Curated annotation (Swiss-Prot):
DNA ligase that catalyzes the formation of phosphodiester linkages between 5'-phosphoryl and 3'-hydroxyl groups in double-stranded DNA using NAD as a coenzyme and as the energy source for the reaction. It is essential for DNA replication and repair of damaged DNA. Its cofactor is Mg(2+); Mn(2+). GO terms for molecular function: DNA ligase (NAD+) activity; metal ion binding. This is DNA ligase. It comes from Psychrobacter cryohalolentis (strain ATCC BAA-1226 / DSM 17306 / VKM B-2378 / K5). GO terms for cellular component: cytosol. The active site is at residue 137. NAD(+) binds at residues 53-57, 102-103, 135, 158, 195, 310, 334. Zn(2+) binds at residues 428, 431, 446, 452. It catalyses: NAD(+) + (deoxyribonucleotide)n-3'-hydroxyl + 5'-phospho-(deoxyribonucleotide)m = (deoxyribonucleotide)n+m + AMP + beta-nicotinamide D-nucleotide. Residues 613-691 form the BRCT domain. Its EC number is 6.5.1.2. The gene is ligA.
Amino acid sequence: MTDPIAPLTSKDINTAKSAANEDAIVAQMRTFIDALKKHNYAYYVLDNPILEDSEYDQLRRSLLELEEEYPDLIQPDSPINQVGDMPLSAFTQVTHDIPMLSLGNVFEYDDLRDFMRRVNDRLSVAQQSPEYEMELKLDGLAVSLKYAYGKFVQAVTRGDGQTGEDITQNAKTIRNLPLWIPAASDIELLEVRGEVLMPKAGFERLNRLAEEKGDKTFANPRNAAAGSLRQLDPAIAASRPLAFYCYSVNQGLPEHIKTQSAALAWLKTIGFTVSAVEVVQNPREAQAYYESVKETRGDLPFEIDGMVIKVNSLALQQQLGFLSREPRWATAYKFPAETVMTRLHAIEWQVGRTGAITPVGKLEPVKVGGVTVSNVTLHNFGEIQRLDVRAGDMVSVHRAGDVIPKVTRVWTDQRPENSEPVKLPSTCPVCDSPVVLPKDEALARCTGGLFCPAQQVEALIHFVSRRAMDIDGLGASWLISFFEHGLVKTVADIYQLHNHQEELITLEKLGEKSVQNILSAIEASKQTTLARFIYALGIRGVGETTAQNLAQQFGDLDALMSASIEKLLLTPDVGAITAELTYKFFRAPHNIEVINALREAGVHWDKVEQVASEGLPLDGQTWVITGALDSMARDEAKAKLQALGAKVSGSISAKTTALLAGDKAGSKMAKAEKLGVKVVGEEEFLVLVGE
């Protein structure tokens, strides 16, 4: 006999009513959330709103009222959470668990076939040619997202591939980015990667509003997306029409999924937006799909700049592995460069860091390859003469990928009757010093030197740049402002800015915290390397590689400063012109004064460990490296050659002993063959260095 059922108390009845009421409230919340998410997808991704603004606002208000009344019942994926958090003071740097590598590029059908052939060659002969998966190459900002047991916890930009910026608070505001994934609630860590982009219609709306307010507009959707994600105030990012498209799973993929296409299908089922996918078997099918997308890409709601082609099998991807900067199993098939016609209204002359006078064409603004172009470099006076380009001409402007736009043709049949040939200015447009065009040089130059304000400012900008003294946060705009306010004239003055802290704080938009950050970065930059310091000085003809070679050759700044032209010529990559320019630089009283001031300010570096090449296997040899190596980065290969006594140069000449050629060796290979320079493959190189 079972025990009789105990009678319900009034407390039990109230608890039951409360539970039922909670279920009803949650159900109502879910109805609002699902409707809002559906609208957000239609609006921000498809650009096809399904609700009027007033209907959307009413839905949102209804959900917000419920959440304010029942905060304990707020759902983890509520769109109310996507409105922006407190502003940040700075972005945190995060190291990627798995590097975010870039892709190699192909531009023609023959390149595509070569890519697939290389894939086949690397796979076992017993295997059939693999199938490939093709995706749209979205033109946005690459980011990595992490979810812990289904909850969104972190977003990081690609950065340099190894380290990116934590943009979690901004990413939370992206309307189609899921904050909670029920289907992934049992996955300890899910990492997905994709592109944050701005749909074309949203971009046009954003720029239209900016124009109405008199604010600066964005050049293209990609810049707008990147700029939105890098706002310290998440509320600004929340106001921008951003969308996230997922293209890979890097951690947490269920084991039963074996292909890239299946991975994207799974991502779609759990709540992510993915682009169109096509599986192909060979180059011919890949080309057909590429052509079809190229013809219809204008109908897409977002910008793309090509296709991405991946080996579909995840196991084969693992087998094929990676080069130092890109996977062997994937490549980008870029769309051809776009060429458009527009009018060139004027030609202006700019002055660079070394006094180079460069002509810049001012165009009627025109969209080329997704970017609005209003300026175009004309390189030098010789190029102007070659093109016979004049103010008022109709010109063809060409742009491929991220390459700087250039004029490829002048339509002389449409030239105005009153046009006149362009003349090289006789005086500097900034300081009025005489302009000279040295014999055997393409660039005209201002003779004003550091008397010329333009050269002074450009020298300052170069000095603080990432590959020089790397003074983080001290950008061009601040340097120009400091220069105009008389706080800096030479690079040595940068290290005296701590004496002007109050003046810096009073400058427009530069608060106490920003000033402190800049001063801290300046202080940190005092510990550098001799090679960086030499490069930062901005000696004409001395790039990064030459600066490294000079540091290694002389080992000491004083030895370099006192070196004769004959001794300078013993340095790899230093020819007669660079040797003479370097020699003269270190004998100019002003330059010596600046260098002494930098040292007195505390700029220093560790002693250079010079490699004694005498008696080493490659002593007296000069090598050049080209292409991508499978086994190591090129810098590592360079170090191994130097350890054996070789000099490593950046250019091929008759004096070159050997060319180390990796994958995708380009014009240097052809030049080596023409000059009869020995070409060494990677396997032979590894034997040479004992690996």
